[in-house]
A protein has these predicted regions:
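Active-site-adjacent structural elements that line small-molecule/cofactor binding pockets in enzymes
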Residues: 1-309
Length: 309
């Protein structure tokens, strides 16, 4: 059996376990990078007390380093799963990525999920690298990860891939537990599940604003969306789904904003989460966009948790 086939078989066996472990709804946030570490520790304890089982953290230019950040948050919590959404493959070589994951899963069994992704051309350029053939590059990177030397205890690091298009989704099914799509409307979840098949894990990010005021909610949504609409991977994915250039312009049409970011009361947010589940998602990680940036980042989650959990 080849390494790739073996990983796929193992992934199918483990994906259902991880779907249950993550729970139906988790949290995705970059807010913690803006807080002192002491406040981030308090945040993860608050998430646990609310009943969430998983927290997804990002990694970008200027953010905390993914493995160090995950280690801090794992140490501060008792049961919470910390997932990287995602760790950038351009930020470290494949050996460092593999062994960072092995270290954390050894220290915190069943509580660390390694999400990795190919990033975006502008970010890669700033790192002095050239972005090209992302699927092929990811495949080669995974080969190098799987062959990485390690003198510590033999442990298997559970991983998912950031995936939007069909080829990366299929690679997620072949070489990982599954996929972590980001910045997608619900129709993408249907497509993702079809490409993955029934076994692999599908963990979808969903942005949300807890506000009934259309002007306030859409303003918060557009602040969030602007940077992503300027990135080809996200823009091209939306075009592939049938959205026009006019929809993508000026922070997004109202129709696109409402498709990418759910807003309203906690019931409206739960309805969007339920639609992702109906279309094949195992886990939906809510990224709650704050309308009051001075308020604690967990305030809105308290209201949402009462409905979605």
């Amino acid at each position: 059996m080849s390494a790739a086939v073996g990983i796929a078989a193992t992934g199918r066996g483990k994906a259902r376990e991880w779907a249950k472990r993550l729970g139906a709804v988790g949290v995705w946030t970059i807010d913690l990078d803006r807080l002192p570490v002491a406040a981030a520790r308090e945040y993860v304890r608050a998430l646990e007390s609310l009943g969430f089982q998983a927290l997804w953290i990002g990694e970008g230019l200027g953010s905390r380093e993914a493995f160090a950040n995950a280690g801090v948050l794992l140490a501060a919590s008792q049961r919470l799963i910390i997932a990287t959404g995602i760790a950038n493959i351009w930020a470290r070589d494949a050996i460092a990525m593999a062994n960072g994951g092995r270290t954390l899963i050894d220290a915190y069994p069943d509580r660390f999920l390694l999400g990795i992704g190919v990033s975006h051309a502008p970010t890669v350029k700033l790192r002095g690298e050239t972005y090209a053939k992302p699927v092929e590059h990811m495949r080669e990177y995974l080969d190098a990860m799987d062959g990485a030397p390690y003198v510590g205890p033999k442990v298997e690091t559970p991983r998912v891939l950031a995936a939007l298009g069909p080829r990366m989704l299929r690679l997620s099914a072949e070489r990982a537990l599954g996929a972590h799509p980001y910045f997608v409307p619900v129709e993408h979840t249907t497509i993702a599940r079809k490409e993955l098949g029934e076994g692999p894990l599908l963990a979808v990010e969903q942005a949300a604003v807890l506000s009934d005021d259309p002007a306030v909610a859409r303003a918060a949504a557009r602040r969030y969306m602007k940077r992503y609409l300027d990135l080809d991977n996200y823009a091209n994915n939306l075009r592939r789904l049938g959205w026009s250039d006019a929809d993508l312009a000026a922070g997004g049409s109202d129709k696109l904003v409402d498709a990418i970011v759910v807003w309203g009361d906690a019931g409206a947010i739960q309805s969007r989460v339920a639609e992702h589940h109906e279309r094949g998602a195992d886990h939906v990680c809510l990224q709650v966009l704050r309308t009051d940036l001075a308020a604690p980042p967990s305030r809105e989650l308290e209201a949402i948790a009462k409905v979605v959990l």
